[in-house]
Amino acid sequence: MIINSLKRFGITTGAAASAAAKAAVIGLLNREKRNTVVIPTPIGLRLEIPVEKVEIDSGIACAEVKKFSGDNPDILDGLVIRCCAKLNESNEIVIVGGKGVGKVTRSGLKATMGETAISPTVRDMVINAIREVTDKGIQITIEVPNGDIIAENTLNKMVGIVGGISILGTTGIETPVSDDDYLEHIKCELNVIRQSYDFVVIAPGNSAAKYASKLFDSNSIIKVGDRIGDSIKLASSVFRKVILAGLPAKLLKVYAGIFNTHYSQGDARLESLTHASVLAGLPYDVLTKITNALSVEEAFTYMTKEQRRKVMKIVAEKILSRIKSFNGDINFCVIIFDYDGESLSRVGC
C-alpha cells in the first residue's frame, strides 16, 4: 500500500508578482535573463521561484512567472503574472497595476477605493525583493494576461473588485488544501458590508441569498458556503445584529452542531429532521416516512405546510440556542426558508 502523505505547497499571486518583478529588474539593470529568482517572504522564509520568460528591450524589461497552487484546488493555478520594470527619476519603487489586475470599487478592503487590487503586504514583498537587487528608483507594472476573464470565475466582484484579479498573499506561501484564503475573503466582504450596514445576513448558498434578498437589501447579504460557524463568529465582532438565513437541509446540520457543513465534516440532516419532528409531535406514520426518505426535500413532501412550520421553528430555536452557547452577547436571528422561498420560521428577529 502506498500512502501519499506529502502535500505540495504553492505560492500566492503576491509571491509570483515579487519574483517576476525581481527577475524584470535583474534583466533591466544587468541585461541578464534568469531562469529562477529567490525572494524574501514576510515570514522569514526565502523562496526560489521559476521564471518562465524574460524580455529585455531599451529602457524596459519584463518577466513572467506562473502561479503554482500546490495541492490547493485553485482556479488561479498556472496563471501568468507579468511584471515590467523601468527606471524612474526618484529613489522610490512605484508599483502600478496594469491590464488584468482588478480595481477596488468599494470601501472596506485593504486597498483604497479607486486603486488597483494589490494588497499592502504584496507591495512590501515586491519592494523588498527589488531592494535585494538595487537602490535605484524603479517603476513596476504588474499585469495578468486574461485576468479580466479569469476574474469572472472568482469571488472578486462580490467584494467590489472589478476588471481583473487581486494580487494577494500574507505569507507568500499557499498551504496545501487550505481554506484560509476563503476565510480571508469572508472577512473582506464583511468589512465592505459594515461600511453601509450595522447588520449582516449570512446565507450559505445562492438560493438562500436569493430568498433573503426579498427581505433585505442584497448588499447586506454575504454568501459563505459551508463556513457558517466561522462566518457567524467573524460577523458577531463587528455587527450589531447577525442574521442567518438558509434552507432546511443546510440548517439541519447546524441544528446537529455541525458548523462547517461540508459533506466531509458530517451529515445528520435526516436524523436532525426526524428528531425535530418528534419534538414537534408529528404523527407516527409521518415520522416513518421521514425516516425512510432519501432527502430533506422528499421528507417535506410528506408534511403539511403547518407541520413544516412547527418543525422548522424547533430547528431555528435550537440553532439560536447553539449560537448563544458560544457567544451569549450576540444579537442573532435565524430565518429558514421553504424550497419555494417562503419563510417557514423566524426566531430572534
From Swiss-Prot:
GO biological process, one term: anaerobic cobalamin biosynthetic process
GO molecular function: cobalt-precorrin-5B C1-methyltransferase activity
The keyword Lipid biosynthesis is assigned to this record: no
Chemical reaction(s) catalysed: Co-precorrin-5B + S-adenosyl-L-methionine = Co-precorrin-6A + S-adenosyl-L-homocysteine
Keyword tags: Cobalamin biosynthesis, Methyltransferase, S-adenosyl-L-methionine, Transferase
Pathway participation: Cofactor biosynthesis; adenosylcobalamin biosynthesis; cob(II)yrinate a,c-diamide from sirohydrochlorin (anaerobic route): step 6/10
Enzyme class: transferase
Identification of the protein by name: Cobalt-precorrin-5B C(1)-methyltransferase
Taxonomic classification: Archaea, Thermoproteota, Thermoprotei, Sulfolobales, Sulfolobaceae
Gene: cbiD
